[in-house]
């Protein structure tokens, strides 16, 4: 196993911010948000640090999107092991020798209005992944259709890992149902209901009235699997 790349203190702080932002909102921060957090004069300074992290192999930068930052799987594993190291030391089996936990998740296809999203007839197939890939334990997968969340780094054909939830905080990326349509959007509560906000200026905000009978929050985005990983 390769040694973890040596990061400067600032690079480690930025990496920690990326991880915590993904856990909190389901998406990485923008360059502008990183610059604001650390008091940089411009987003260009944040970009320089991100390029350095990419050269060291801990993140991947995706072109054409302001949130195009992805943690490499080895980075996620390292973060996960660091968090669990204290627990692992309580057992006789060294943490490095413990087999990675596996999760088998159903992929939800088309959904019929009025029936539970995880009803058997909605399950297309299942995939198995290592648990460390996700910020929180997901309950199911949903295939992204379209480019409405492009600027959050979520592209057509990707799989979203979803944790069931009945509540969401403003700014979190959610999976919501409108009748027989399931959509991935950013959540914002307004005085008159819920706004489902795309991350692409070519798409309109969807406003859902507070008393809408056809609306349901199905869960929170807790992970992303690129469609290229499934080939």
Curated annotation (Swiss-Prot):
It is an enzyme of class 3 (hydrolase). The active site is at residues 148, 185. Residues 31-51 bind DNA. It catalyses: Hydrolysis of Ala-|-Gly bond in repressor LexA. Its EC number is 3.4.21.88. Pfam families: LexA_DNA_bind, Peptidase_S24. CDD domains: S24_LexA-like (cd06529). It comes from the Bacteria. One of its GO terms (biological process) is DNA repair. The record marks 113-114 as: Cleavage. Keywords: Autocatalytic cleavage, DNA damage, DNA repair, DNA replication, DNA-binding, Hydrolase, Repressor, SOS response, Transcription, Transcription regulation. One of its GO terms (molecular function) is DNA binding. NCBIfam families: lexA. Belongs to the peptidase S24 family. Represses a number of genes involved in the response to DNA damage (SOS response), including recA and lexA. In the presence of single-stranded DNA, RecA interacts with LexA causing an autocatalytic cleavage which disrupts the DNA-binding part of LexA, leading to derepression of the SOS regulon and eventually DNA repair. Homodimer. This is LexA repressor. It comes from Leptothrix cholodnii (strain ATCC 51168 / LMG 8142 / SP-6) (Leptothrix discophora (strain SP-6)).
């Amino acid at each position: 196993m390769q040694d973890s790349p040596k990061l400067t203190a600032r690079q480690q702080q930025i990496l920690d911010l990326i991880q915590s932002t993904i856990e909190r909102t389901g998406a990485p921060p923008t360059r502008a948000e990183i610059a604001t957090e650390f008091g940089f004069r411009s987003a260009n300074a944040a970009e320089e640090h991100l390029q350095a992290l990419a050269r060291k192999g801990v993140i991947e930068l995706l072109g054409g999107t302001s949130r195009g930052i992805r943690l490499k799987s080895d980075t996620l594993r390292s973060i996960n092991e660091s968090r669990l190291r204290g627990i692992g030391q309580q057992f006789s089996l060294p943490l490095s020798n413990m087999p990675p936990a596996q999760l088998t998740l159903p992929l939800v296809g088309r959904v019929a209005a009025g029936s539970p999203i995880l009803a058997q007839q909605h399950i297309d197939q299942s995939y198995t992944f290592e648990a460390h890939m996700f910020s929180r334990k997901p309950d199911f997968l949903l295939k992204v259709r379209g480019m409405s969340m492009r600027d959050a780094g979520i592209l057509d054909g990707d799989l979203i890992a979803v944790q069931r939830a009945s509540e969401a905080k403003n700014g979190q990326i959610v999976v919501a149902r409108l009748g027989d349509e399931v959509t991935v959007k950013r959540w914002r509560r307004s005085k008159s209901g819920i706004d489902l906000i795309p991350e692409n200026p070519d798409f309109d905000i969807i406003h859902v009235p507070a008393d809408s009978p056809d609306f349901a929050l199905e869960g929170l985005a807790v992970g992303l699997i690129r469609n290229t990983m499934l080939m």
